[in-house]
Amino acid sequence: MFYNTLIKIYSKSDPNSYIKSIYADVQPYLKSIMFEDGFEINITRRVFCDIENSISIHSYMEIENEKYKVMDIKKWDSYMEVYLYKLKRQV
């Protein structure tokens, strides 16, 4: 893994909720999540990074001036995988 992409972490989609920046390995990813009412969203990015306590399923991230919502997190021994949904409305 190459931690060569700068990621800004936010507690909300609001730019004033900035927490910190980290470097991570960001990869394209495609998975759909279907909800009961037929609503579907696509997970389009997967982030690999060191375990970071400031990242939760309530977090938002900014990568290359685009905002994402954290949808899922898988923690391993020494790193974590974070699955992201690209926001349609860039706040």
Task: List where the protein language model places each region.
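Short, isolated positions in well-ordered beta-strands
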Residues: 68-70
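Short, surface-exposed secondary-structure edge patches
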Residues: 50-55
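N-terminal disorder-to-order initiation segments that are Gly/Lys/Arg-biased
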Residues: 1-48, 72-91
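Structural motif
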Residues: 63-65
